Each structure stands twice: as structure tokens, then as C-alpha cells.
A protein has these predicted regions:
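C-terminal end-of-chain micro-motif
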Residues: 1, 323-324
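N-terminal [4Fe-4S]-dependent radical SAM core
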Residues: 1-20, 235-239, 248, 297-308
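Conserved glycine-rich "GG(E/T)P / GGGxP" loop and the immediately following alpha-helix
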Residues: 13-206, 211-216
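The −1 position to Zn-ligating cysteines in a subset of zinc-ribbon hairpins
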Residues: 26, 30, 244, 311-314
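Solvent-exposed loop and edge beta-strand segments that line ligand/cofactor-binding
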Residues: 41, 241-244
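C-terminal accessory region of radical SAM enzymes
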Residues: 149, 157-158, 188, 198-240, ...
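Short, acidic, Ser/Thr-enriched surface-loop or helix-capping motifs
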Residues: 254-255
Length: 324
């Protein structure tokens, strides 16, 4: 874990070391609709999760830690224990940013977040832009559940959340903004759209004034104008540098066997991104580095980076340094 490259925001004034982890524990839930697969029994002990968090923080001198997609950890029976453990190991000035999905709210999750004494930021990722598309992707009736969960976050969280929506068409942008604006209005929050990523200081300033920031991003903005082209290109080279906050490692998933799976940043089957399906085929950290440092991958990154098609900083942080 200590060899993971620190991630940097592309703007120097916001630059800091941090890492992003998602824990892909196993359970016996029927997850076809949400995860695209049935996964088996729990097999990652809480102590192992603590060890990974602690090693990561110490190894990278992290000022900011992202246990990404934390509400997906409803599949882990001790999600709240993990959040509380962050309280034990946090250092002065460290911020914890929880990236959650509105499909799930684990028991006690909101209460646990409200009890934390250090600074945290809850970013709620919404997949699907209207009732029809949501139910088509997630299963009939799921949209109603999501709306109910969002209302709970808005009413019960001590600090206002940030909402993060991907969109591809202008119609989806319009539906997204109307959808979240109406929900926020119900509980007395104003909405302000932002185009910078969730690390930007302006997010905090907006929240401090009692306004909900809504980060609506065009999903293809860092890669190419035509998302279909990305998928076609991925078919050829077996990876796609796909991210939404100026770095290649949006999240890494670690299982109990020590396998590390790219999540969000790189997909073996990127069609899963649009369907909100994670393809966790066996894929170790060594595999990831081999792909990143291959001539084919670096050439692709170099060509697209210099053409301004996406803004990952691999060229500046990777040992290959072919752009410099």
C-alpha cells in the first residue's frame, strides 16, 4: 500500500496528499440489480479494514481520506465501526470525505456521521437522472427509495451534503437540476450549481451559507467528447482512464485476499459505469501498474492529455514521465 502514488488536484493551490479506498467486502445479499453480481459471505475482518486505513494514512501522510461509496458498505455489518475508527486515527487538519450513494442508508449511519468531532464532507452520488431511467437501471420502485433516502439526508444530517450528478445529454442536465432543486426546496435549502470538483474551497463556503452545492458534471469531460469513442477505445487496449476529479485513482477496492481493484477510475468493462455496475474481475495492483506503464497505455494517455481531452495527472506523477 505504501507504493501507491499520491494523488494531486490539478490546481497547485488545492494540492494535497490523499488516497481513496473502497472496501469490497462479501455478503449474501441479492445484488444483481445494484451490483450486477451475487456476492458471497462477509470475509474481511474489521481489524483488517482498520489496518488498511491506518497503514494508508501513515504511509502517505494523508490529510484527506476518502472511503469512497461508503453507503455501499451497508454490505459490511460494521460500517459504523469503520466511521468511528476514523475518529480514533484522524490527525489535526485531516478531513474525511464520505462519498455515498443514495440507494442505501445503513442503520445508524447518519447518527454516526453527526457524532463525529472532526470535519467531514458527505458527497451523495446520484446515478440515473429521472424516474424512468433510474427504475430501468436499478429495478422497479428503486427511484422512490432513493428519493426517500435523499430526503432523510437533507433533513437529518448536521451539515448540508453535496450532490454529485453525472450527465451526458443536456436533457439529463435539466432533469437532474430540476429534480434535486425541488427536493431541497422541500426542506428549506437553496441550491447552487458548481462546476469545480468537490475539493474546491468554494464548496465549504457555499455550505456555510446554508446552501446545497450541486456538482453536475458532463461525464465525458475528462476523456473525450464522445463517450462511445472511449468505450470503443477501451475494447482495444483493455482499460480506460475514466475519472471525474483530475486524477487516475478515483478509488481502489481491496478484498481480503489482498487483490486491489480499480473502481470508477478504471474499468475492464466501462459500460458498467453507465449502468452503475462494478466489474470486479480479479485485477491486482501489479496488473494496474503494468497497464499504466505499458507503452500502449502511456501513449494513449499522452496523446489524449496533450490534446486536452482529459485532465489526469499521470503524466506528471508516473515514473514514465513521457509528457515531460
Amino acid at each position: 500500500m505504501k507504493t501507491i502514488h499520491p494523488r494531486y488536484n490539478s490546481r497547485p493551490e488545492y494540492r494535497m496528499h490523499y488516497a481513496s479506498l473502497t472496501f469490497n467486502s462479501k455478503c449474501n445479499a441479492k445484488c444483481q440489480d445494484c451490483c450486477g453480481e451475487i456476492i458471497n459471505k462477509p470475509d474481511m475482518p474489521l481489524e483488517k479494514v482498520k489496518e488498511i486505513l491506518n497503514v494508508t494514512i501513515q504511509g502517505l501522510r494523508i490529510k484527506k481520506i476518502y472511503p469512497s461509496c461508503l453507503a455501499e458498505m451497508t454490505l459490511i455489518p460494521y460500517v459504523n465501526d469503520i466511521v468511528k475508527y476514523m475518529e480514533e486515527i484522524h490527525t489535526a487538519g485531516m478531513i474525511v470525505s464520505q462519498d455515498t450513494n443514495a440507494r442505501f442508508i445503513p442503520d445508524g449511519f447518519i447518527e454516526t456521521l453527526n457524532s463525529l468531532t472532526f470535519s467531514y464532507h458527505l458527497s451523495i452520488s446520484i446515478w440515473g437522472w429521472d424516474e424512468e431511467s433510474w427504475n430501468r437501471l436499478q429495478g422497479e420502485g428503486s427511484f422512490e427509495t432513493v428519493v426517500g433516502n435523499i430526503r432523510r439526508y437533507l433533513k437529518e444530517l448536521k451539515y448540508p451534503p453535496t450532490f454529485s450528478f453525472p450527465y451526458i445529454t443536456d436533457e439529463q442536465y435539466t432533469k437532474t437540476l430540476a429534480f434535486i432543486t425541488e427536493l431541497c426546496k422541500e426542506v428549506g435549502y437553496q441550491v447552487q450549481t458548481v462546476t469545480t470538483n468537490s475539493d474546491a474551497p468554494e464548496i465549504t463556503a457555499i455550505k456555510d451559507s446554508g446552501i446545497i452545492p450541486v456538482y453536475i458534471r458532463k461525464y465525458s469531460q475528462h476523456v473525450t467528447e464522445n463517450i462511445v469513442d472511449v468505450f470503443c477505445e477501451q475494447e482495444k487496449i483493455d482499460y480506460v482512464p475514466f475519472n471525474n476529479c483530475d486524477n487516475l485513482f478515483q478509488a481502489l477496492t481491496i478484498d481480503s485476499l489482498g487483490n486491489i481493484y480499480p473502481c470508477t477510475g478504471m474499468y475492464r468493462k466501462p459500460f458498467a459505469v453507465l449502468a452503475n455496475v462494478n466489474d470486479y474481475s480479479p485485477f491486482t495492483y501489479k496488473d494496474l501498474l503494468d497497464i499504466l506503464h505499458s507503452d500502449k497505455a502511456m501513449a494513449y494517455i499522452h496523446d489524449n492529455y496533450t490534446a486536452g481531452k482529459f485532465a489526469c495527472n499521470l503524466c506528471k506523477t508516473c515514473s514514465a514521465r513521457i509528457c515531460n
